[in-house]
């Protein structure tokens, strides 16, 4: 398994079928974006959980496989060499099959498009693991998507928030927009673009330009959280000979890529009608494991799921 939280689930489901697995993760911790980018965020699309944080979800998945699989962190898989009946991974592991579950891939944040000194950079954040670090401060949150809205709501539990977006309309859940508008310690500034940033008396002084208006507006902030999204990169797959559509991997209904023995699941994949939901990815991981079992053991009568009679 190569990749994020779906790799953990796929390893567990593979163990149920008697397969031996290894999970590789290029990061220092397994779990992908939910663990590294927004561990405190409440995830609402997991069946049987009304709401669960990224950290709690990862911990439950890790607990399921703690005695079932080997996890190798801080290891970016570079070379995959096809053999007659399997693959050699980085000259250290032989595997009969591979599942890629890297999500959006290696992610690099889109930065605030301003000239910024090193002193100011210390007050600008692209990752927030603990929003309580902003307690009793005034924090600017830049962005208009789901991540920006989620971050603004979490930070608002501890600080005053100014949510700054270049459009009047947000690209996140309307329910979150309504929540933010109802909070007295949240000010929504739209449609504004940041034009200049300075450090004055240990505070950030941001010059904002309203769309269609020449006059600038200045706001003072203690720190800034930038949620403009991330530049994804799954180009490693191309090196392995896997076809890509932009940054995604096309798969067939069995979750197989264009290479026999290599499968993919989660937000890394693309096919008509797919939506980027964690819950959907769990099902894709199960389909991939089932396909691997049928390929490796065609003579076996396969129990597809735990509720089979």
Swiss-Prot record:
Q: What is its EC number?
A: 1.18.1.2
The SS bond pairs are none
Q: Which SUPFAM superfamilies match?
A: FAD/NAD(P)-binding domain
Q: Which reaction does it catalyse?
A: 2 reduced [2Fe-2S]-[ferredoxin] + NADP(+) + H(+) = 2 oxidized [2Fe-2S]-[ferredoxin] + NADPH
Keyword NADP applies? yes
Q: Which InterPro entries match?
A: FAD/NAD-bd_sf (IPR036188), FAD/NAD-binding_dom (IPR023753), Fd--NADP_Rdtase_type_2 (IPR022890), Ferredoxin-NADP_redctase_2 (IPR050097)
Question: Which terms in the Gene Ontology molecular function aspect does this entry carry?
Answer: ferredoxin-NADP+ reductase activity; flavin adenine dinucleotide binding; NADP binding
Indicate the enzyme's highest-level EC class.
Answer: oxidoreductase
Q: Which residues bind FAD?
A: 25, 33, 38, 77, 107, 267, 307
Could you list this entry's UniProt keywords, alphabetically sorted. FAD, Flavoprotein, NADP, Oxidoreductase
**Gene3D superfamilies tied to this protein:** FAD/NAD(P)-binding domain (3.50.50.60)
Reading the lineage from the top rank, the first entry is Bacteria
The prosthetic group or cofactor this protein requires is: FAD
The record's comment on cofactor binding reads: Binds 1 FAD per subunit.
Please provide an example of a Pfam family that matches this protein in its UniProt record. Pyr_redox_2
Matches recorded under PANTHER family: THIOREDOXIN REDUCTASE 1-RELATED-RELATED
Q: Which family does it belong to?
A: Belongs to the ferredoxin--NADP reductase type 2 family.
Q: What binding partners and quaternary form does the record give?
A: Homodimer.
- According to UniProt, the name of this protein is Ferredoxin--NADP reductase
């Amino acid at each position: 398994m190569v990749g994020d939280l779906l790799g953990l689930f796929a390893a567990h489901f593979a163990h149920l079928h008697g397969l031996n697995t290894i999970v590789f993760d290029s990061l220092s911790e397994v779990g992908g974006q939910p663990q590294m980018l927004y561990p405190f965020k409440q995830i609402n699309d997991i069946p049987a959980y009304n709401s669960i944080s990224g950290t709690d979800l990862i911990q439950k998945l890790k607990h399921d496989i703690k005695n079932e699989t080997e996890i190798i962190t801080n290891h970016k898989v570079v070379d995959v060499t096809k053999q007659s009946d399997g693959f050699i991974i980085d000259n250290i592991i032989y595997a009969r099959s591979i599942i890629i579950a890297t999500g959006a891939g290696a992610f690099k944040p889109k930065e605030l498009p301003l000239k910024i000194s090193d002193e100011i950079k210390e007050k600008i954040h692209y990752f927030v693991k603990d929003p309580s670090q902003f307690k009793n401060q005034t924090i600017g949150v830049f962005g208009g998507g789901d991540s920006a809205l989620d971050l603004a709501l979490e930070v608002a539990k501890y600080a005053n928030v100014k949510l700054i977006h270049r459009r009047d309309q947000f690209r996140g859940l309307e329910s979150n927009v309504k929540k933010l508008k109802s909070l007295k310690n949240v000010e929504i500034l739209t449609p504004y673009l940041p034009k200049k940033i300075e450090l004055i008396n240990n505070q950030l002084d941001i010059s904002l330009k309203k769309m269609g208006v020449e006059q600038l507006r200045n706001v003072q902030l203690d720190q800034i959280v930038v949620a403009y999204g991330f530049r994804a990169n799954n180009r490693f797959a191309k090196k392995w000979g896997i076809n890509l559509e932009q940054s995604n991997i096309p798969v067939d209904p069995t979750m197989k890529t264009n290479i026999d023995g290599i499968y993919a699941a989660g937000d890394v994949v693309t096919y008509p009608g797919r939506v980027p939901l964690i819950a959907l990815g769990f099902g894709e991981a199960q389909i991939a494991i089932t396909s691997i079992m049928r390929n490796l053991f065609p003579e076996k009568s396969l129990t597809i799921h735990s509720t089979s009679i």
